[in-house]
Regions:
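Active-site and ligand/interface coordination hotspots across diverse enzymes
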Residues: 1-98, 174, 235, 242, ...
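Glycine/proline-rich loop-helix segments at beta-alpha junctions forming the active-site rim
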Residues: 3-4, 8, 131-258
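Short secondary-structure capping micro-motifs at structural edges
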Residues: 61-64, 90-91, 104-113, 165-166
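Residue-level preference for short coil/turn positions at secondary-structure junctions
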Residues: 70-71, 117, 177, 211
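A structural signal for short, well-ordered beta-strand segments and their strand-loop junctions
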Residues: 77, 115-116, 120-125, 180-185, ...
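Flexible, glycine- and charge-enriched loops at secondary-structure boundaries
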Residues: 92-100, 148-155
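Conserved alpha-helical elements of sugar-nucleotide-dependent glycosyltransferases
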Residues: 95-106, 198
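Short, surface-exposed acidic-centric catalytic microdomains
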Residues: 102-142
Length: 258
């Protein structure tokens, strides 16, 4: 990273940590932090999720603290929300479960992309609030007005902070390389989905900015949906990069109508 990129990245990271602490305190003051944990457990049990240790209701991505000034950031990948493995005390990192393994192996198998998933990628989410399954966020929102407010507020913050970080990194690069954004998982970005606030805010923030052309939308890595979709929509007459770009733009236009 350039010196200015590093400065801006650190500012983003510090604000992220501050927001996690702020949201945590907000629930503590309202005396519903334990209620959130109970709801997270209950919704997982109701969905038949095998028992797992519930450690952290809000998850900051500790992988961000592993980034050093000499790292070459080439991509920002945005998932949905932290799952079972991501929230464990020994992890507190995004995309470390099966989906993360699939993503990591995809880049390892395709060195022509020039991306090390654990070294060249900043991984974020649409909200830092944990659930075993993304759809369970809707249950939390129905059970508590404050949780609903917090889930929406966190989406808006993530959209703003991510768009700003992306644009800042591009504007302060050495001009040699582009930095892309991959939105992986778009089911809840459609219709009356959970992440409509995120979608609409993100589109508004990129309005008139050239960085929008490097935002791509894909199926989620989970259950190999990303790989299956890419395989079905790839041409043998195009490079992998060309196929990825074409597919990512197609999904972006379908979701954002732009």
């Amino acid at each position: 990273m350039t010196a200015r990129q590093w400065e801006l990245f650190c500012a983003f990271k510090d604000e992220f940590k501050s927001k996690i602490a702020q949201w945590h305190k907000k629930l503590e003051r309202a005396n519903i932090l334990q209620e959130l944990k109970d709801l997270q457990r209950q919704t997982a049990d109701k969905d038949g999720v095998p028992f797992y240790e519930l450690s952290e209701p809000f998850v900051y991505n500790n992988s961000l603290d592993d980034v050093v000034p000499t790292d070459d950031i080439k991509l920002i990948v945005i998932g949905d929300n932290p799952g079972k493995k991501e929230q464990l005390a020994e992890n507190r990192r995004y995309l470390v479960g099966q989906s993360g393994v699939i993503a990591e192996n995809f880049f390892k198998r395709n060195p022509e992309l020039g991306i090390d998933f654990r070294k060249n990628v900043i991984i974020l989410n649409k909200t830092p609030i944990h659930t075993a399954k993304t759809k369970e966020l809707s249950v939390l929102m129905k059970q508590s007005p404050l949780l609903k407010e917090l889930i929406i507020e966190s989406q808006l913050w993530f959209a703003r902070a991510t768009a700003k970080l992306h644009c800042d990194l591009i504007e302060n690069s050495d001009g040699e390389k582009s930095i892309g954004v991959w939105l992986v998982g778009y089911a809840e970005l459609k219709g009356r989905g959970l992440f409509i606030p995120y979608r609409d805010e993100l589109l508004k923030l990129y309005e008139g900015h050239d960085a929008w052309e490097s935002v791509f939308v894909y199926q989620h890595f989970s259950m190999n949906r990303f790989l299956i979709d890419l395989g079905k929509n790839s041409s043998i007459y195009k490079t992998l990069s060309e196929n990825l770009q074409q597919l990512g733009i197609r999904h972006r236009q379908a979701i954002f109508c732009k």
